[in-house]
Structures are given as C-alpha cells and as structure tokens.
Curated annotation (Swiss-Prot):
Belongs to the SecD/SecF family. SecF subfamily. It is a multi-pass membrane protein. Forms a complex with SecD. Part of the essential Sec protein translocation apparatus which comprises SecA, SecYEG and auxiliary proteins SecDF. Other proteins may also be involved. GO terms for cellular component: plasma membrane. The gene is secF. It comes from Petrotoga mobilis (strain DSM 10674 / SJ95). This is Protein translocase subunit SecF. It is found in: Cell inner membrane. It holds the Pfam family SecD_SecF_C. The chain crosses the membrane at residues 12-32, 138-158, 166-186, 190-210, 249-269, 272-292. Keywords: Cell inner membrane, Cell membrane, Membrane, Protein transport, Translocation, Transmembrane, Transmembrane helix, Transport.
Amino acid sequence: MPNIDFVGKRSFFIYLSIALILFSVIVIFVKGFNLGVDFSGGSEIIVSFDKSYTIDELRNGLQTINQEYATAKIIQTNPGGGASDQFFYIITVRDSFPTLEEKQMFINSLEESFSDSSLNIEQFNDVSGYAAREIRSYAWYAVIISLIVLLAYITIRFQFSYGVGAILALAHDVIITLGFYSLFGIEMNLTAIAAFLTLAGYSLNDTIVVYDRIRENRSKNRGMDIESITNKSINEVIVRSLNTSLTTFLVVFMMFLLGGRSIASFAFGLTVGVIIGTYSSLYIASPIVIGMVKRRKKTQKA
C-alpha cells in the first residue's frame, strides 16, 4: 500500500481548484459556448454531393440564398472517394423551417446554388427557437435535480457533511469541464448534457469508494484523528481508483478521437471529466469532509 500524504497537501490543491474554477468561469463569460442546434435553434442539414467543395465555396453558394448564411457552420464528414464517390457535409444555419413547404423551398434553393453537382439531402433536423429554449431549460433542470438527489442519497447513506463534500466536488467537476467545453469550442448539445449526467454518476462512485473506506476506518480507529484516517483511507483505495480511471479514460479518449462527430461532445465531456473527477474525489471531496468534521467537533465542545 502506498503512503502518500494527500491530506497534508490539501491547501495547495484547494487553491489550485479555486484557480481552475475562476479560470473556467472567466473563459465561459468571455467565449461563451458553441451551442448546437438543440440549444440555439435552427436547422442542421446533412447533404451529399458527387463532387468536392471547399468550405468557402459552400458558404458562397449559401450566401446566394440568404446573406446571413455566410456565417453558416459547415463540417465535411468524409473525404469522398471509394465505392460511393460521395462527399458529405453537415450544414448548420440559424433559421428553422417548420413546414414541409419551407423545407422544400430551402432544398430547391440549395439545388439551384449547386446546380453543377448532384445534391442529396441525407438528413434534415429542424429545431425552433422556442423548442431550443425548452430543451435547454429541461436539460439544466435534469442536472440540478440529479445533484439534489445525489445529495440526499449521500446524506442518507453517510452523513450530511459527506453529502456536502460530494456535491461541492461534483459542482467543481461540472464547472471546470464546462470551462474546457468553452475553451476548445466543443459543441454544447444534448449529448454533452448526457456526458455531465454520466460524469456525475462516475465521479460520485469514485467519491463513495473513498467515503466508505473513511467511515470503515473511523469505526476501527476511534482514537485516530480525522486527517490520519482520511490519509490512510485514500492510500488504501488509490490504486483501485487510478486503475479504474485510467482504463475508463483510455476508452472515452479513443471514442473522442475515432467516434466521429455524433458522439464527440459526449466523449469529450467524459475524457475531461474522468481526469477532473478522479482528482476531486482524492483532493477536494475528502478535505471538505475533514473541515466539516473538525468544525462540528469544535461546535460540540463549545
């Protein structure tokens, strides 16, 4: 079993976490988020051509339909060639086309703008501004409700101080991960929210492993101070935690690299979240419990 002084260095890591949270908040306020169609409203059209276009050529063609489309988000999803000899692009515009007639008018305009190529509409996803606001609201409600439920669960299973430590650690993980989404311009959509909910469960599981060992060691070593018990407990579970985190990280990182655009937001959130969650379960959740236990003892003595 390793013998690392985790607790002795807790002040450094708490200040480090505060710095990371402040950095994340600043990045979010300065850059904002790259909102997907789910959250911003608009249309996402997957089109295929039998010839290749540059992004600028596509934007110029879209601009002939509507000047605002000059800033459309365009992603090429394959290099073309092979058996199908098709070139696929994802075009995202801020307009929504709620009726079939409006969709068809837009498709006709696309065909006119790119008449030198055979165009096929592979997929047409449309989200109105109202629906986007509803989705965004319900997504964040899901995150907040999950945090409340997790607080109740930890409080019932352990003590209120443990619940506070777990929720603060989870909030720490979510804020820093949000900062990375903003910093790297990763699309914020429903799969990203799924990543945050998955991260909450993963991070909580890691924290519970540590808390369970702390509770067990407190019952066995009643004469030992809380700092020593916490340090002993973390050292007993760290190998398991790091092995689990490493294998999980490798899987989600490969998903991010190779999984394609459809799961990129989800895989990115877990790639960052596994690292931050493992760190917080060792250096944030446990020190918070130490502080609250010592504070409660002082209050009881007074």
